[in-house]
Amino acid sequence: MDLNQRKEKKGQHVGCCGSRTDLSADTVELIERMDRLAENQATASMSIVALPSSFQESNSSDRCRKYCSSDEDSDTCIHGSANASTNATTNSSTNATTTASINVRTSATTTASINVRTSATTTESTNSNTNATTTESTNSSTNATTTASINVRTSATTTESTNSNTSATTTESTDSNTSATTTESTDSNTSATTTASTNSSTNATTTASTNSSTNATTTESTNASAKEDANKDGNAEDNRFHPVTDINKESYKRKGSQMVLLERKKLKAQFPNTSENMNVLQFLGFRSDEIKHLFLYGIDIYFCPEGVFTQYGLCKGCQKMFELCVCWAGQKVSYRRMAWEALAVERMLRNDEEYKEYLEDIEPYHGDPVGYLKFFSVKRGEIYSQIQRNYAWYLAITRRRETISVLDSTRGKQGSQVFRMSGRQIKELYYKVWSNLRESKTEVLQYFLNWDEKKCREEWEAKDDTVFVEALEKVGVFQRLRSMTSAGLQGPQYVKLQFSRHHRQLRSRYELSLGMHLRDQLALGVTPSKVPHWTAFLSMLIGLFYNKTFRQKLEYLLEQISEVWLLPHWVDLANVEVLAADNTRVPLYMLMVAVHKELDSDDVPDGRFDIILLCRDSSREVGE
């Protein structure tokens, strides 16, 4: 077709198949001239850059298969291919110049030309569907370059390519929307370099290829959504958050040991009598005769609630790690023992609600008896004075043996028939209550706790203390006691262990008094009956101690006594003697049982005794 005919084709488009429409005649003429010039230049350069066909075939097939996959979207990389020459030819939709030509949508440089969809090298041209190079051919889904091909939206460098999800460089990584070349040529949609051409979906590098979900670099690749830190140890996270520090362990241990020794000396100076059998009352400054009656027998580690001074796997004496133990040789009284005794002293001064709040206040010291002792010792003088005030009446009764007379209690005489009863009547009532309990096989502790007449035959048939306690545990007495009363503020074994090794002195005194009970029964003219043995007797006192209704009534009627909040003090108080209305001496626990019976509305309507019936039955056998 001559030039005039081409001009007449004005307005035709140059499409991907070679047709030229929508272009002016001048443009068509210019294109034709450029085509001829390109053909001449290509012919001249063939002798310079053309490679043997065998070498090309080897590069384009064997080596490609060796390093790459044949999948439609796979990457193709060539190690042994030649670089593109200074001149490049393009197909019918590509512009090429000696130095550079620019198509409407394509950039071509001295070292490379790129079609919008096609890469072509010096020795081959690529049509709209296929790329062919001297060393590689690439279709619309495949890139072929001398050294690397990169996705349209991917960065490529001489030594690295990165796809849309991957950053990979030898020395640096670029993001998925940036083109980087050796020499910097950039098209609006395509990046082309001397060493890189871009296909629409594939990345290829000299030493590594990266698909849309794979990281590949010559030495390292970095994913765009991942953090990679490299260091000499290969673990940057550990080094950043746990820096390696060169610590002189021997020096550290020596310093720690010196601190422990210093703390040990301070504690020994603060509590100097721990080498003897010291208790917390001595530490507070009480005299020995006062300590005898305020002594906290029956108080041990089980007095403490669960979790208070009861951590396992630590030193039993100070509750510290063995490396930090502050106990010293020859120490007979541990700091933990003094701490639980100090806790018992605080219980002496508080009712149930106040003590519960106190336990919450000292929560930071629940695992630190040494720290609690320091806290306790700060108010040492204040605690001593408070005990002297609150327990003056108790020491007067138990230590000086001051007599309690029911007639001195105005509220008692006005509010209870028991306070107008003679000593004989009180004793008869006491024996009668026990006789009824024995006959009905009633559970003693539960009865005195809330007047509940549950049956427990095993308790009455027990031959020794162990069987007796097992019977109580079997019927759930201790569990109910903890759930219903302030016994829950102590350890779960506290009440149970009161029947074992505690109260030995009081037990001896009680068993010696059994002969007195026999003489009393003979003097009353009744057939002697069995009096309760020690375990049943202690069950009665424990039930009365945790019976809040009874306690409040007794303390209101008997004006000479006040509140006691420790079981040992209650048991000791119950064994003092009082003067009945006829000035006869009776143990206080007998008066307690009489008041308890009076409060039992089922047997004593309106809380009053029928004195006439009681006297009428005085000659009748009491007990078995």
Curated annotation (Swiss-Prot):
Region feature Disordered, mapped onto this chain: 113-249
Biased composition (Low complexity): 118-225
Basic and acidic residues composition-biased segments: 226-249
Annotated Gene Ontology cellular component terms: cytoplasm
InterPro entries recorded: RLR_Helicase (IPR051363)
Coiled-coil intervals, chain numbering: none
Name of the featured protein: Putative uncharacterized protein YHR219W
Naturally occurring in which organism (per UniProt): Saccharomyces cerevisiae (strain ATCC 204508 / S288c)
